[in-house]
A protein has these predicted regions:
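Positively charged n-region of N-terminal signal peptides that target proteins for export
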Residues: 1-11
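Alpha-helical transmembrane segments
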Residues: 13-17
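C-terminal motif of bacterial Sec signal peptides marking the signal peptidase cleavage site
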Residues: 18-22
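Exported/periplasmic ABC-transporter solute-binding proteins
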Residues: 23-184
Length: 184
């Protein structure tokens, strides 16, 4: 088994609770049932949500048995945006005007509140690699951690880490395989 290195990017991809949350929201029925929407097993967003909210018991998700399950961030957002009585969760970088992020303990889901710790529901994104990277893969990681790479992170609604300076890679040609969260 090959050793893996983990580069922690404190991107703090926030799990912003999404909902049309106000009783004044158009179509909200304060006496109606709340539709809980969750992600599929194996979703990193789901894993972080159940851990952060303390609803994981003996490695099992105890959110609610009747939750509607979605398999992608955009499906979660569409499901919530089309049902005024629905609630779900996404990463901050995915948040747009179709859904509303809920306040947690009175704190809004903002980059500033995540960085100062008042919005407590956040998680880092990580880069996991094999111990021996190809020149192309190493160059890609160098780009991600550079000023230019962290600007891409920030421009996409996530929280950048301290960069390693300007990108000065060799720009090799080659192929790398990337997999992981649909939140990124």
């Amino acid at each position: 088994m090959m050793m893996k290195k983990i580069f922690t990017l404190a991107l703090a991809a926030v799990l912003a609770g999404t909902a049309l949350a106000s009783c004044a929201a158009k179509g909200f029925d304060k006496d109606g049932a709340i539709t809980v929407i969750s992600r599929e097993k194996g979703s990193g967003t789901r894993s972080a949500f159940i851990e952060l909210f303390g609803v994981e018991v003996d490695d099992e998700d105890k959110t609610v048995e009747t939750a509607d399950i979605t398999d992608k961030t955009n499906v979660m957002m569409t499901s919530v945006s089309q049902n005024a009585n629905a609630i779900g969760y996404i990463s901050l970088g995915s948040l747009n005007d179709s859904v509303k992020a809920l306040k947690i303990d009175g704190a809004a889901a903002t980059v500033e509140n995540i960085e100062n710790g008042s919005y407590k529901i956040s998680r880092p994104f990580n880069i996991a690699t094999k111990s021996d990277l190809s020149e192309t893969a190493k160059d890609f990681v160098d780009f991600i951690l550079s000023d230019e790479g962290q600007k891409v992170v920030e421009d996409n609604g996530y929280i950048p880490v301290a960069s390693t300076g300007a990108y000065s890679g060799s720009k090799p040609s080659g192929k790398i395989s990337i997999g992981g969260s649909s939140s990124v």
